[in-house]
């Protein structure tokens, strides 16, 4: 068993840039969700088909299941942290080494048996139509220890973030039952608050009074990083960056949301006062450009 328990807080300035961490080949086009479960602690979706290869992997790792974690509030629900920044939630995609081991149960006994991909969820002003396909299934598993067929066409590729650079470290599964190599995508995917709140309506296992209660949160707090634990990064050296990927993404999301608001305002008032609407949208674009250039300049100054 690995001495490093998961999850952890990833300090980007201490991550080691590793040229051997090539881009992953993610083959989810043939993956198909079979069942969705409320385990009483989390939402689990079982898959048939789909696998990982390439990158640092010696062979193919078959997709087994997807787990979802969340918190009481939208700003605190992920297991892993990036520079002490917690996201709204987290998806874990569990894979096992089918070429080397005969079953998932056999694979979990070895430190090269499991690969877990982590995808962060970030609440924004817009619904994620692909994530909604999961949300739509939740009514069928409202009570604990229930399972139902996943009766919707669902393409897992659509839940991958826009950037696939990643952190890597050797830790454990979230319940500490086995070793696992973690692949953490620092770029999140956006979902709406209403979509995340639906998970808080699920019922957990009965408490000591014999009464079920809502799973309002199920994330785990991070464990201290051991002195000999090394976290690697697949991208360029990030120690020179002034902000963590999380904060940098937050700023870019803010700019994106600002533009979306501007376009909505433009569409709303274009018929009533076209001149005013055009002036407003030009002003916001100029402001966005200024803020973006300021952030880039500040980043270069800190790097030097």
Swiss-Prot record:
GO terms for cellular component: membrane; viral envelope; virion membrane. Apparently non-glycosylated. GO terms for biological process: symbiont entry into host cell; virion attachment to host cell. This is Cell surface-binding protein OPG105. One of its GO terms (molecular function) is carbonate dehydratase activity. Residues 295-304 are intravirion. Its main location: virion. The keyword Membrane applies. Belongs to the alpha-carbonic anhydrase family. The gene is OPG105. Pfam families: Carb_anhydrase (PF00194). It comes from Variola virus (isolate Human/India/Ind3/1967). PROSITE patterns: ALPHA_CA_2. Residues 1-275 are virion surface.
């Amino acid at each position: 068993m690995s001495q490093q328990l998961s999850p952890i807080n990833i300090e980007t300035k201490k991550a080691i840039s590793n040229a051997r961490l090539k881009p992953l080949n993610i083959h989810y086009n043939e993956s198909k969700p079979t069942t969705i479960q409320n385990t009483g602690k989390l939402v689990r979706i079982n898959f048939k088909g789909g696998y990982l290869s390439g990158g640092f992997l010696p062979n193919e790792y078959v997709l087994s299941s997807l787990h979802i974690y969340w918190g009481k509030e939208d700003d605190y629900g992920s297991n892993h942290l990036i520079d002490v920044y917690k996201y709204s939630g987290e998806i874990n995609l569990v894979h096992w080494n089918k070429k080397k081991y005969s079953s998932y149960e056999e694979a979990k006994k070895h430190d090269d048996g499991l690969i877990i991909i982590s995808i962060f969820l970030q609440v924004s002003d817009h619904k994620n139509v692909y994530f909604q396909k999961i949300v739509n299934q939740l009514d069928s598993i409202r009570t604990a220890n229930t399972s139902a067929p996943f009766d919707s066409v669902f393409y897992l590729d659509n839940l991958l973030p826009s950037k696939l650079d990643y952190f890597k470290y050797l830790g454990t599964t979230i319940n500490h039952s086995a070793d696992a190599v973690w692949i953490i995508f620092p770029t999140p995917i956006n979902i709406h608050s209403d979509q995340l709140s639906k998970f808080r309506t699920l019922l957990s296992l009965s408490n000591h009074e014999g009464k079920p209660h809502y799973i309002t949160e199920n994330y785990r707090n991070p464990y201290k990083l051991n002195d000999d634990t090394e976290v690697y990064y697949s991208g360029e050296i990030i120690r020179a960056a002034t902000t963590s990927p999380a904060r940098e993404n937050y700023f870019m999301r803010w700019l994106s949301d600002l533009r979306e608001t501007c376009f909505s305002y433009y569409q709303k008032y274009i018929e009533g006062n076209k001149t005013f609407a055009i002036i407003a949208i030009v002003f916001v674009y100029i402001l966005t450009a200024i803020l973006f250039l300021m952030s880039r300049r500040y980043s270069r100054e800190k790097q030097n």
